[in-house]
């Protein structure tokens, strides 16, 4: 009889960028790749977004804390899964086997990652959650190193499972390459103002795509001339990648960097901060800045567009959601062996 795995899918429909992309793609691919060995249920506020092949279990609550303290444990008791898989923040009180994915630990490394209250909460609940998990999934070697160093985890307990890239992001009609693109949450940690300065230094406008986590920063970007779009549908995002002169991501801390592989898969050069996770993802297929010269790094990328585009396409081909799902199934097997 197949074993039931319950996946917390609270992020569905919340425009949470990388976290939501990860959960969406796991839910699509796990049922196909796991065969008859496992079956899956998603605990979520948005059952309408759960793909075919996964049981949708609706759990509503006004606050995330109440959802995890009351709603999710109640669902787990009813479903009686062999294993539960959660994101790295708050996890419920549950005695069964648990896997936790850590996307990044930026709140531990930089004060600009989130507000003071949320940062204080995360500093308590994240180590508690990963400490209770049977296995921890890290999305990059950098995130694994952070988790081991900060929380004293046994390295053997942490499995690196990189993200993938959706086939929707592919090279197509090149467009005009008349703008620079920034994709990510609008927050100080991502430093979109540096992307704007680099674009303007090179005589190009900046298009900003992503949830406006810090409204004052989004307003400042608009005041300085950026085209701030907010969250957009995947089809529109794919077109924006293909039409961009370059993606500029000056982030001060990343756990992985899904926009990097999406841009590379689209044939678009990438300009990145010299961040360990971004180096891990892009390798030599990017132009890097040390934090003070994004204008120069962008000029270099524009001048070397053909080589960076080809190198990026090759690099992005190494990252697939099927491989992410396969490695995740291997983690489930190891926990239940």
Mark where each language-model region is.
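Carbohydrate transferase catalytic cores enriched for Leloir-type hexosyltransferases
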Residues: 1-337
